[in-house]
């Protein structure tokens, strides 16, 4: 993959350790222990940066009795993602904000996260880094068909923007306008790429991929993807959850509809609007966590870290975010594992969203503590 071309297009300067890692690293470059050392160093550095430069976050830490130096990553104060529905957290001056991104708002009030240029560039780097889990192509060897808008028409909706960034890495055709899929254009582009001898990558939310499959079946159309078609999904089923398929059913539908050689050609991605990094699945459909992100599962009642392999409330510390402190507790229940062997590193499995009042109440109390401090309650 010619990521340097994309880097030049966006005037990205990889000048620090984390930028070298994001823009020039590969997932299998380090042992598990080396990755853990990288994570510790980078996340602690990010914590000190935000502690010194973000008054809101520093006062929150002081309220919890945590100073600027931490020995253990688990000591770094985290806050619930619901904070972003209540206020804008900024470590930089307002005039350094490149864009303010919103969530899709499927569950009510939208989150708003302000990002500077470097944070956005690092997000692009995480997409490039994650594509290495899928395969290794130069930009002249693959073309993409995106069931979504380009980044100029994503209307600042985070998921749409993230999915559109691939156009900076590979030639990309966009076949959705205002959430309307042009099925014929999608298939025409896929056939054009196939005839050129290049690898095809179809990307989009799972519901849109599902609708394309339904259209093809209704029209009696087929596509022989063989080993030359990859399908990357992201964003979940959202408001179409009532039509969702479980993963095995979804994979089977895609393998049959597109005549794929293996389910390994189907990959999901994970990202949420408050997180500045995109996680890609490997060949075993495990979401790999890059070394600049610390992921853990917390006990929903005590918010204490759980042993690897146990399900709990997902928490992330993302060192790539410059414009805001990305030290989060989410509304997801998931499992964090450490992997050795051929693919060393940390993986996450998202099981479900939080449903019980007790779990949400814990996040609410943290939000109230954060906002109370901002109102002068020190």
Swiss-Prot record:
* GO process terms (BP): bioluminescence
Q: Which GO terms describe its molecular function?
A: ATP binding; long-chain fatty acid--protein ligase activity
Provide this UniProt record's keywords sorted from A to Z: ATP-binding, Ligase, Luminescence, Nucleotide-binding
* Catalytic reaction list: a long-chain fatty acid + L-cysteinyl-[protein] + ATP = an S-(long-chain fatty acyl)-L-cysteinyl-[protein] + AMP + diphosphate
Q: In which pathway does it act?
A: Lipid metabolism; fatty acid reduction for biolumincescence
Give EC number(s), comma-separated.
6.2.1.19
List the protein's name: Long-chain-fatty-acid--luciferin-component ligase
Native organism is Vibrio harveyi (Beneckea harveyi)
């Amino acid at each position: 993959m010619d990521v340097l071309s994309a880097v030049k297009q966006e005037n990205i300067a990889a000048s620090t350790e984390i930028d070298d890692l994001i823009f020039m690293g590969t997932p299998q470059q380090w042992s598990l222990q080396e990755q853990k050392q990288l994570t510790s160093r980078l996340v602690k550095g990010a914590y000190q940066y935000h502690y010194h430069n973000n008054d809101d976050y520093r006062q929150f830490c002081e309220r919890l009795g945590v100073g600027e130096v931490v020995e253990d990553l688990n000591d770094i104060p985290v806050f619930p993602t619901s904070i972003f529905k209540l206020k804008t957290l900024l470590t930089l001056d307002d005039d350094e904000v490149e864009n303010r991104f919103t969530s899709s708002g499927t569950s009510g009030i939208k989150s708003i996260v302000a990002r500077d240029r470097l944070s956005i560039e690092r997000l692009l780097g995480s997409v490039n880094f994650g594509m290495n889990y899928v395969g290794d192509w130069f930009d002249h060897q693959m073309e993409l068909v995106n069931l979504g808008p380009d980044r100029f028409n994503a209307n600042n909706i985070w998921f749409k923007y993230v999915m559109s960034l691939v156009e900076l890495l590979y030639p990309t055709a966009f076949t959705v306008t205002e959430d309307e899929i042009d099925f014929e254009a999608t298939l025409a582009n896929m056939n054009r790429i196939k005839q050129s001898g290049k690898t095809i990558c179809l990307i989009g939310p799972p519901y849109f991929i599902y609708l394309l499959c339904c259209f093809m079946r209704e029209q009696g159309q087929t596509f022989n993807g063989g080993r030359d078609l990859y399908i990357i999904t992201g964003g979940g089923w959202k408001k179409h959850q009532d039509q969702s398929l479980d993963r095995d059913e979804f994979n089977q539908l895609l393998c049959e509809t597109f005549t794929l050689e293996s389910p390994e050609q189907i990959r999901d991605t994970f990202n949420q609007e408050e997180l500045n990094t995109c996680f890609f699945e490997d060949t075993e459909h495990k979401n790999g966590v890059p070394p600049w992100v610390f992921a853990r599962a917390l006990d929903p009642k005590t918010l204490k870290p759980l042993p690897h392999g146990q399900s709990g409330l997902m928490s992330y510390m993302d060192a790539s975010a410059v414009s805001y402190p990305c030290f989060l507790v989410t509304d997801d229940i998931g499992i964090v594992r450490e992997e050795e062997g051929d693919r060393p590193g940390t993986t996450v499995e998202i099981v479900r969203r939080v449903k019980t009042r007790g779990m949400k109440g814990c996040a609410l109390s943290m939000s109230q503590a954060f906002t109370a401090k901002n109102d002068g309650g020190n």
